[in-house]
Design a protein with these regions (language model features):
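Transmembrane alpha-helical segments of polytopic membrane transport and secretion proteins
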Residues: 1-30, 114-117, 292-305
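Transmembrane-helix boundary motif in ABC transporter permease subunits
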Residues: 7-9, 18, 48, 52, ...
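Membrane-interfacial helix termini and adjacent extracytoplasmic/periplasmic loops
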Residues: 15-19, 136-177, 241-254
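Interhelical loop and adjacent transmembrane-helix boundary motif
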Residues: 22, 57-58, 72, 179-182, ...
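Membrane-water interface segments at the C-terminal ends of transmembrane alpha-helices
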Residues: 35-57, 120-158, 174-176, 231, ...
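Transmembrane alpha-helix signature in integral membrane proteins
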Residues: 78-112, 171-178, 209, 282-284
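C-terminal transmembrane helix and the adjacent membrane-cytosol boundary/short C-terminal tail
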Residues: 106, 188-196, 272-305
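Intracellular coupling helices
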Residues: 118-124, 185-225, 299-305
């Protein structure tokens, strides 16, 4: 009996020991890059927090005064900051929702087998390949008043970028035009790992195209869609370049990033600007953790199914 237990226990111990060694080796290999990322990412955050707790002057080198949470009180007591938060949330919800729906449609089109598929994929990805600043300049040229492309086509002299809510809508549309291909690319990657045999079996069972989409495609795509939503939501909350180039953050288009930049660079209120940047970081982190908990729970539930 003892010999049998030793014989069966030894391979298990060896397997467990090998697994631990592999985990330790993996940690050692990843450690240098993780340390580098932590240092590069942590230093700006630490410095921004330090700066947000001080009144800092560039006129006298090294002159700073402890301000405690005064800068945070000023930011949270500023109606412009709350307006920027509202604009940011509207931009995030609207742009991410549209990009997900359009990206899904584009991914389905790119995944379909037909002549010219390669040309379609290349054409669809062109807007995403452009620099965001270039995209903003293109859209500003289209809507600039009074002789922009849109006004010329419709024979109007509407000040599109100078009034609310048109300016924010144009920024949302510009972001959707540029970033929907990115969502399509992520969703397409999810489509390509769905086994074709599943669809063949559904066809044999008499499932319609809509039934195959709702019962097979969407459920199996959900992990890819949820991951894409995380990336885009966190990126949208930090939007800066589109509103800055198109409107300068004016006319109801200010965001958390543009108002922080205005305080920091334009008004030289470095402590206040840093406090606004830290508040933006906190908003992004809260949304990030909420998403991770939600997505993690959903993915585990899908795995159990």
């Amino acid at each position: 009996m003892e010999a049998a237990s030793i014989g069966t226990g030894t391979p298990e111990r060896l397997k467990r020991s090998k697994g631990l060694q592999e985990k330790q080796l993996a940690r050692l290999m990843v450690a240098p890059s993780m340390i580098l990322i932590a240092v590069v990412a942590a230093w700006p955050v630490i410095y921004a927090i330090w700066l947000s707790l001080h009144e800092y002057s560039v006129r006298v080198a090294g002159l700073s005064r402890w301000a405690g949470f005064d800068n945070y009180s000023s930011a949270l007591g500023n109606s412009d900051w709350w307006a920027a938060l509202g604009h940011t949330l509207i931009f995030t919800v609207a742009s991410v929702a549209l990009e997900t729906l359009i990206g899904l449609a584009m991914a389905l089109a790119m995944h379909a087998a037909f002549k010219g598929q390669g040309l379609l994929r290349t054409t669809v990805l062109v807007p995403w390949a452009l620099l965001t600043v270039v995209t903003a300049i293109i859209w500003r040229t289209m809507f600039v008043s009074p002789y922009g492309f849109v006004n010329t086509i419709f024979g109007t002299k509407t000040v599109w970028l100078g009034s609310e809510p048109q300016a924010l809508i144009i920024i949302i549309l510009a972001d959707v035009w540029k970033t929907a291909p990115f969502m399509a690319l992520l969703i397409l990657a999810g489509l390509q790992v769905i086994p074709g045999e599943v669809y063949e079996a559904a066809k044999v069972d008499g499932a319609s195209t809509m039934q195959r989409f709702t019962r097979i495609t969407l459920p199996l795509l959900m992990p890819a869609i949820l991951v894409a939503l995380i990336f885009r939501t966190l990126d949208a909350l930090r939007v800066f370049d589109l509103p800055y180039v198109l409107t300068g953050g004016q006319n109801g288009t200010s965001t958390l990033s543009t108002i922080a930049q205005e305080a920091f660079a334009a008004n030289r209120l470095y402590g206040l600007g840093a406090a606004m940047a830290v508040l933006t970081f906190i908003v992004v982190m809260v949304v990030s953790f909420s998403y991770i908990r939600f997505v993690g729970g959903n993915l585990r539930g899908m795995g159990d199914d």
